[in-house]
Amino acid sequence: MNKIQNLNPQCIWKNFYALTQVPRPSGHLEKIQQYLLDFGKQAGVYAVKDPAGNIHFRKPATPGMENRKGVILQAHMDMVPQKTPESTHNFETDPIEPWIDGEWVKAKGTTLGADNGLGVAAIMAIMEDKTLKHGPIDALITRDEETGMFGANELPEGELQGDILMNLDSEHWGKFVIGSAGGIDVTATLDYQEADTDADDAAVKVTVKNLRGGHSGLEINEGRGNANKLLVQVVRELIAETEARLASWDGGNMRNAIPFKAEAVLTLPKENIAALKEIVADWQTTFNDEFKLIEPQGIEVIVEEVATPAKEVPVEIQDNLVDAIFACHDGVIRYIPAYPSVVETSSNLAIINIGEGKASIKILARSSREDMKDYVVTMLESCFSMAGMKVETAGAYGGWDPNPDSEILHLLLKEYKELFGKDGIIQVDHAGLECSVILGKYPWLDVVSLGPTMKSPHTTTERALIETVAPFWELLKKTLEDIPVK
């Protein structure tokens, strides 16, 4: 038995470990869907896959508690697939390798999937525990939350039964989330006719790497380096000073993760390679001085001589693209005026792919205000349309408006104080949660989000704080037992 399965409470950790052994990257969920269906049937609860690909459990009330308000427990089954450069992990076929490092559970070379595997594991523990006392419980485990909340957006109306929604996708133990930001995906694209490379030119690959990355909602306010935004500074100077020409660009791979690596292939006269290397070395020094408190592990900016490609980006298009990337806002745009420590609006320059006659730039914009979300979209449209790019939006979801008078919130705060002797914290998150989407279909629900502590989700340093899982479980059980009558 893996040591993780012996952690307290075993009912959650054994289920979480089992989830790590089933591949479940966003977009490839057939194995985890079948696993959850089989689990539900073995647990003796109602278990179906709905037309959207979500898994729906239903557990009847403990005898005598049928008159309690119905609770819907909710989490998402998919995980962000990120791995270290040296990792050979295949997320579609290989199990995650979790391990215990002191007070944390981590993964070897990949994301851990505690976001949102611990929430799913808690739901599984509720479903299979015959000793718990509770009213009627529905559970919704959604598909593809990380890539656009597709399961929640396609949730059939009328599928769920309940009065209260408890989302288990928050990542700060002791904080109870009652609101979150909305978001929208913005994609700029351009098709272009490639130019021939000068046959006498050399080529180099310039890479910015070893950044921390992170969650583009929860950690956007920390000032972490964005590999695309750092690389564009380097590339812009190399074009100006060494006659370099852009052949290709690849940076970032997840819309909701701060990119930790980006690389560009450049062509240039052979006699300018030495000057290029000096400029790149200077940028590495500059970046490490600028980010020394935020990226203490050390940012790497490296040059590798590569085979000269046959084609490159035409000069005018290259200049337009580089200028647009340079001008594109990244990071926090505004904080909530009434809560100056809470981010209201942000954008994440997430993914850039340029080469073979195509350019694609993807940004995730977030805001707790619809008018500010629209403002960011217009700003990005202006930025990239000036470069001749076509700008489209998709995957829009609204924010979740806080309800400080929520009955389930105040029950949780009461139980938390009685169990642990301290006050819980009410919070509004800048991250997107499925609560807003589900509320759009079930507007009468009383909603709250909670969970154990996790750090650096969406990165290869993702980790779960072991000591917070047991109290999370105790609070969940006690709250379900004390849900009021209808």
Predicted regions and their residues:
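Substrate-recognition/cap regions that form aromatic- and gly/pro-loop-enriched pockets
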Residues: 342-431
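Acidic/His- and Gly-rich active-site-bordering loop/insert found
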Residues: 3-103
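Zn-dependent metallopeptidase/amidohydrolase metal-coordination segment
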Residues: 9-12, 337, 344-359, 364, ...
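Acidic, glycine-rich active-site loops and adjacent beta-strand->loop/helix elements
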Residues: 77-79, 140-148, 170-173, 212, ...
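Active-site-adjacent substrate-binding region
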Residues: 219, 226-228, 232-249, 402-445
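His/Asp/Glu-rich mid-to-C-terminal helical/loop segments that flank catalytic regions of hydrolases
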Residues: 158, 224-241, 268-273, 319-326, ...
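Midchain, well-structured core segments that form catalytic/ion-binding scaffolds
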Residues: 103-106, 146-147, 153-365
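Active-site metal-coordination/substrate-binding segment of hydrolases
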Residues: 65-163, 203, 315, 326, ...
